[in-house]
């Protein structure tokens, strides 16, 4: 069966922020107004993970294989749901005991890093980055062509063809010019992450960070968004997920927050890796502001009052 509405943030994740009717409060980052919506209607686009039909061979068109990325993501999400529930159950148990404890073991950390990597690469924000990049290349090529028109003696210029790589799906038979189509390029990126799983570069970076699981006992709920993984850079050392001193945060629910710390600057905390900590009100507020500033468009909350955060 063809799936029309495809999510770039899993519903099993959004459910942790929703009420029993699976409804969640939504706000656009450009306006303080909020509204209640079912999680099935947010963080999604029609056919977001479909390969464009014009890029498929006749054989694959007949098999309706344009949705293989969506199918793979759905299969992974079933495992992600179980892993997420395990972490929440563990944190609830630790919270009851009111003491810091190891939340997960090293093997589970590596396993969960793959889910985080997949979330990072599959969002609308990532799609936009690819679109901006391809537009910049197109603009540059046009300017160069215009320059050559006015300077005939200048040597011909062309962009090198990309080197083929193995993906999670056998792409033999596809007629894809990925370097010229941002959406297809993004789908290749998602597919590559699916294929490599915990062995992907992004997964390894996350697994190498120092993890703290924050418990929010304040009256302010943790927010999430259509780009749930956010980055807090250290001084001027860059905003990459492996930049020196960077902190990468991922809200698990209104009460729980995973914060990953780059392990060279934060090396003194290695002995506390994978343990729980209590979040202060300032920490919760700081994280919520990151969600608002780094979302693509929408912020999600378990409560209607987003308060003074969205300004």
Question: What are the language-model segments listed below?
Answer:
Residues 1-5, 9-311:
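Alpha-helical structural context detector biased toward long hydrophobic helices
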């Amino acid at each position: 069966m063809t799936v029309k509405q495809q999510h770039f943030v899993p519903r099993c994740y959004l459910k942790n922020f929703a009420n029993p009717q699976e409804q969640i409060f939504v706000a656009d980052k450009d306006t303080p107004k909020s509204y209640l919506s079912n999680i099935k209607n947010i963080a999604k686009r029609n056919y977001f993970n479909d390969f464009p039909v014009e890029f498929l061979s006749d054989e694959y068109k007949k098999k309706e294989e344009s949705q293989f990325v969506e199918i793979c993501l759905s299969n992974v999400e079933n495992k992600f749901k179980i892993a997420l529930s395990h972490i929440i159950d563990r944190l609830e148990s630790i919270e009851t005991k009111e003491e810091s404890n190891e939340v997960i073991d090293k093997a589970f950390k590596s396993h969960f890093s793959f889910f985080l990597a997949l979330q990072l690469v599959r969002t609308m924000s990532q799609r936009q980055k690819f679109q901006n990049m391809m537009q910049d290349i197109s603009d540059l090529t046009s300017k160069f062509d215009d320059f050559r028109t006015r300077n005939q003696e200048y040597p011909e210029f062309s962009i090198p063809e990309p080197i083929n790589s193995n993906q999670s799906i056998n792409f033999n038979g596809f007629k894809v010019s990925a370097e010229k189509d941002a959406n297809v390029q993004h789908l290749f990126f998602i597919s590559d992450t699916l294929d490599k799983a915990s062995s992907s570069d992004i997964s390894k970076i996350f697994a190498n960070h120092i993890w703290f699981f924050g418990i929010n006992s304040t009256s302010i709920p943790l927010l999430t968004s259509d780009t749930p993984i956010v980055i807090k850079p250290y001084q001027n050392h860059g905003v990459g997920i492996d930049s020196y001193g960077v902190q990468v945060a991922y809200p698990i629910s209104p009460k729980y927050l995973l914060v990953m710390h780059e392990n060279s600057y934060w090396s003194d905390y290695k002995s506390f890796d994978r343990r729980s900590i209590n979040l202060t009100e300032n920490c919760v507020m700081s994280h919520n502001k990151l969600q608002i500033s780094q979302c693509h468009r929408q912020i999600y909350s378990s409560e209607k009052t987003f308060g003074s955060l969205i300004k």
